[in-house]
Amino acid sequence: MDDEETAEVEVEANPLDPIDDAIQDDLSPLDPPSSDMSLESPGSEDDSDLEALPRWMIPQNRLRSAVDMMVSQARTQNGGIAALLNRDNFLQRVRSMVFSQERRRSRTSDDTSQDGGEQAEEPPQPIPRTPIDIDMEEGVRFDTNLPAEHSYFGNHLSRVPGVDYLEHILFPGEVLPFMIDGSLFDDEMPGLDGLIFGVGFPLMQPPEDNPHKLYGVTCQVYEKGESGRQLVFYKSRALQRIVINCDDIQGPPQYIARNPTSKCFSKVKILPEYFLPEPLKCVDMGSMSRFRDIPSMRDKYRRYQLSSTPWPADACQEYAYEEIVERARKKLEIHKIDTMPRCPIQLSFWLVRNLHLTEKMMRLTFLTDSVNTRLQLIGSTLKEESLFYCRYCNSSLAYCSDLFAMSKHGVQTQYCNPEGYIHETNTVYRVMSHAIGYSGEPSTKFSWFPGYQWHIILCKFCAQHVGWEFKAVEPNLAPKVFFGLAGSSVRIGKASESTPVNGSSFVVRNMLRLISNEME
């Protein structure tokens, strides 16, 4: 898809600067504080005596409260924080907000003293979110097999032979589409074997005991097609986790990243996948084993098993994963996902992709070689309510409970835009009100979802690209509208985080620092 982010970082590719740069650029043309920005300047008739205080005597908590209020108000307006800083007399408006809040506190204090016997009002409860049921929408249900085929590459893809025996998923189980110069692979792709290559994760911090390790996955190409621009479309599937010793790499990886027409080679170590079956399933109860699969006798049978083993019940429960799988199944029923694998190894990686863990938890599940431990880590997150936050300003964008599968591969899928940039996309029914704005015009060109047009969406608070809105252009197609959040622009966080929904402590801190410098 054609948006601000491309594989080659160019100036015109991302016209929206990060929030720190936007703040500095917007404030740079401001002149030094003039008399109308001074706290000693005459105020209106309603101004309190606080306005006559020197600027350095304004309490920091009052200043922060005023800035937080202005930031919250800016989020619901067009232009977000950038528009707030572009207005004239910014510091004067900050000072006026301080005085306005002080007068409001004074009036509230007087009202409270007069009505001291009355009980304080309870804070308003959040408005419950109305659940969305896509089955209630009229029209033809979208075929989730279409996005998995990546048909936006065209219809002239040829199957690469020799990879059918690797159709099973090892890690992460995702199809990785990409578009590069065909000369990189064609010379080394035998006629009967699909090319296997490695994809490294340089941003994944290795363990402290060996900082020279690079983790990644092996991938195998299984389809390719011509683009007509001396580029070749490839589809590959991730297979296994690997670790590379950076000292063994033949060719500097940093140079390869900047020059994609070059290659590097290295020996890799395939990381093992250890799985221990549940201990009680290994206990032979003789003739009583026939009661194992009878629901009414299952609990009693389990108690007999525990009494006949030297292991405590907690030790047996540590390796039990069926309960975790059942809890995950119930949670994913909301997302209309019914393609859960049966193999525990495949299942552990599949759950990581579809349950949307935090970045820290993703790293832990990737680095562990024990499937049982991986499933236990996943099970510890099932009760948590998670949100999508803007990676640039920490503003809340959407609830993870609104995720749903528009592809047979799940709620999170890799897609490639016309410039070759690969986007990790999370599909959700809706985003929070006043959370997004739009950029450019909608288009159906190179659409990842046939029958839908895409429209670039921005975080309304910091004006950074966070994904796309997809709207049906074919009649009777359901869902009518949904959103795709770009994995590079959002992060997963707990709903219990202290980050305010209508503001950002990160932006507030930066504004306070700039205001402090201007007012000294």
From Swiss-Prot:
Residues engaged in binding Zn(2+)? C390, C393, C459, C462
Domain named Lon N-terminal: residues: 157-386
Q: In which pathway does it act?
A: Protein modification; protein ubiquitination
The record's GO molecular-function terms, alphabetically, read: metal ion binding
UniProt keywords (A-Z) are:
Metal-binding, Nucleus, Ubl conjugation, Ubl conjugation pathway, Zinc
Q: Which GO terms describe its cellular component?
A: nucleus
Regions of biased composition (Basic and acidic residues) lie at 101-110
Among InterPro entries, the record links this protein to: CULT (IPR034750), Lon_prtase_N (IPR003111), Yippee/Mis18/Cereblon (IPR004910)
Q: What is its main location?
A: nucleus
Give one GO biological process term.
positive regulation of neuromuscular synaptic transmission
Question: Which residue ranges have biased composition labelled Low complexity?
Answer: 25-42
The CULT domain covers 385-494
According to the record, the residues making up region (Disordered) are: 1-52, 100-133
**How is the protein modified post-translationally, according to the record?**
Ubiquitinated.
Q: Mark out the compositionally biased spans (Acidic residues).
A: 1-11
Q: Where in the cell is it found?
A: Nucleus
Function (record text): Substrate recognition component of a DCX (DDB1-CUL4-X-box) E3 protein ligase complex that mediates the ubiquitination and subsequent proteasomal degradation of target proteins. Has an essential role in mediating growth by negatively regulating insulin signaling. It also has a role in maintaining presynaptic function in the neuromuscular junction synapses of third-instar larvae.
Q: Which family does it belong to?
A: Belongs to the CRBN family.
Q: How does it assemble?
A: Likely a component of a DCX (DDB1-CUL4-X-box) protein ligase complex. May interact with pic/DDB1.
Name assigned to this protein: Protein cereblon
Q: Name the source organism.
A: Drosophila ananassae
